[in-house]
Amino acid sequence: RLIIGSDEETGFRCVKSYFEHEEQPALGFTPDAMFPLVYAEKARATFDHKLEFKSEEGNFDYKLVKFNGGQVLNMVVASAEAVLKGEARDIEEKFDKFLAAEKLEGEVKVSDVITLVLKGKAAHGSTPQFGINAATKLAEFLNTLSLDVNGKNYVEYIATRLANDPFGKVLGIEYSDDEMGASTYNYGILKYDAAEKIGVISTDCRHPKNFDLVSKLATLKEDNMVIEVTSTKEAHYVPKDDELVTTLVDVYRKHTGDTKNDAFVLGGGTYARCLKKGVAFGLLFPGKQDTMHQANEFLEIEDLLLATAIYAEGIYRLCCE
């Protein structure tokens, strides 16, 4: 059976609805990852860091009016923007020096307000260590300025507790095991609005199946911040020695001659987790450029043809032998 989904990036509603009306296949695979094969996918949790606003007091040079970065949780923020009120003075020079030191791009726009824009590097939210989070970088710069108390509390928390730490070490929520690897944290949607008293950092965590993240988060006591869990999803796991896994890996090796790479665990989520017994099988080959979730995403034609041959034999081996 060929099942075509249309909502993979935003909740799998399509496949969930399909299985409410149709019987699940006994087993299956999805071409939504990498070869040789993904036999397990980490658990996922999303949670918000929410700023507790205080009354304005003290002197400051700039007021943080707005701060925005990211549109979806499962991508590293590629562009972020901050709006300030205050005298421009030498802020453009300071920002240019910061960008040069970090080897990043951005710009300053001055009108009745000061707008700072910083460009990072997108990556999949399950591997934030491979991207450059524009929002946390912009917060690092803003943290060097004299800001109003709420703006300062917001950017200081990001700059000192979250920035450059995709594994949660600073907050004390790091965890890893030998089979599923390390927990990762992507700060994917950040929004601050002084007028509406909104200061939120929405986070996407991928973690091993044996880590109780919710209980760990409940123990955190962060100044000026409240942490609220918004969703959880259990890990997906098919034993590595299951016949589904060993058969498909054998087909892959027959067609590629690759005996070095083996089935592995993925931080990302695929349609495989919608099946009681499903795996992600290709179709990015080892050593090939991964442009997933980036501008100009592409696949080489010869890889598509090779993958097609692998899939054809894989389906035959699973269904006809």
Question: Across the structure, where does each feature detected by a protein language model lie?
Answer:
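Short, solvent-exposed loop/turn elements at beta->coil junctions and helix N-caps
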Residues: F35-P36, N68-V72, F264-G268
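Short, well-ordered beta-strand elements
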Residues: I3-I4, L118, V200-C205
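Short, internal active-site loops enriched in acidic
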Residues: S6-T10, K121, G268-Y271
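Acidic-enriched catalytic cores of C-N bond-cleaving enzymes acting on peptides and small amides
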Residues: A40-K42, T46-K121, G125-Y185, L213-N224
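Short acidic, glycine/proline-rich loop/turn micro-motifs
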Residues: R13-C14, V77, T291-Q294
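An extended, acidic, His-containing surface patch that forms the Zn2+-binding/catalytic region
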Residues: S126-I198, S202, R206-V214, V226-E321
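Short glycine-biased active-site loop of nucleotidyltransferases that positions the nucleotide triphosphate
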Residues: Y18, V38-E41, N74-V76, T270-C274
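Acidic/histidine-rich catalytic neighborhood of metal-dependent amide-processing enzymes
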Residues: R1-K54, D165-E179
